[in-house]
């Protein structure tokens, strides 16, 4: 029995290699515009091109598709490539997506040809764009010495109107003490005229105490007693009859009615 080996002879398809011609570019652009950029393996035969599908795809994506920039890469684009490469590394497709109009293949070729030999970092780029920062001289603080008596700090003068108001307030306070036995005596008005230091605890921790009639109690141990501030003697302000009758009544109103 004779065996016959059947050999299927595949006809080799002739494929052009090398630089693309203007005629080939036009054929590829016309076909992609009409049918889209899909099925690159079948595209060359349908478009009448003697190229492989990979060559057609790269030619379209890197050179012929709309939005591609022509010409050399600018200095600003180089700085952006360096910054992105320091952050992302050799991820050329991601870097190309952040630089409009440039392809990943173009950026990779430009990096390997021109930028890989430069050891530039982000700090070097910041100094390049802001050269005036390093030229700023920071002076140390200097001490100011007073050489004469005139070199003194200004002192805020005391307002004369404040002194006059304090004097008038003291006069009204003394008059209130002398009119304690009168019918028009107002205890709340009298207390409002006292300084806050008289109503609050003093520096020695003692408090101002009042008796049943609203009269401050005298404490001989307190050197800063309030009567010394105004030179007031309580027993001299009240006559002996009023002073003796003051302790016979439990109510302040009864005491004032008795004197009227």
UniProtKB/Swiss-Prot annotation:
Keywords in alphabetical order, please: Activator, DNA-binding, Nucleus, Repeat, Transcription, Transcription regulation
Q: Name the PROSITE patterns on file.
A: HTH_MYB
Which residues form the DNA-binding region? 40-64, 92-115
The name this protein carries in UniProt is: Transcription factor MYB4
Q: Where is the HTH myb-type domain?
A: 12-64, 65-119
Chief subcellular location: nucleus
- What does the UniProt entry say about where the protein is found? Nucleus
Pfam families documented for this protein: Myb_DNA-binding
Q: Which PANTHER family match?
A: TRANSCRIPTION FACTOR MYB114-LIKE (PTHR47999:SF107), TRANSCRIPTION FACTOR MYB8-RELATED-RELATED (PTHR47999)
- GO CC annotations on file: nucleus
- State the superkingdom: Eukaryota
């Amino acid at each position: 029995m004779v065996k016959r080996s059947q050999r299927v002879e595949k006809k080799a398809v002739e494929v052009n290699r090398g630089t693309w011609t203007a005629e080939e570019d036009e054929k590829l652009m016309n076909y992609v515009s009409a049918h889209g950029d899909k099925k690159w393996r079948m595209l060359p035969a349908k478009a009448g091109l003697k190229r492989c599908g990979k060559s057609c795809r790269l030619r379209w994506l890197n050179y012929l598709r709309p939005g591609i920039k022509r010409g050399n890469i600018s200095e600003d684009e180089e700085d952006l490539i360096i910054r992105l490469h320091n952050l992302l590394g050799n991820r050329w497709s991601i870097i190309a997506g952040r630089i409009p109009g440039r392809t990943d293949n173009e950026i990779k070729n430009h990096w390997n040809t021109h930028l890989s030999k430069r050891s530039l970092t982000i700090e070097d780029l910041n100094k390049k764009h802001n050269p005036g920062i390093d030229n700023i001289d920071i002076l140390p603080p200097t001490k100011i010495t007073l050489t004469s008596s005139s070199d003194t700090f200004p002192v805020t003068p005391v307002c004369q109107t404040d002194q006059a108001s304090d004097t008038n307030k003291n006069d009204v306070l003394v008059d209130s003490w002398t009119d304690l036995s009168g019918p028009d005596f107002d205890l709340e008005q009298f207390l409002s005229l006292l300084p806050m230091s008289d109503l609050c605890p003093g520096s020695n921790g003692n408090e101002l105490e009042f008796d049943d009639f609203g009269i401050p109690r005298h404490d001989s141990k307190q050197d800063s007693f309030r009567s010394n501030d105004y030179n007031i003697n309580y027993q001299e302000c009240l006559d002996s009859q009023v002073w003796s009758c003051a302790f016979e009544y439990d109510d302040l109103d009864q005491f004032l009615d008795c004197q009227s």
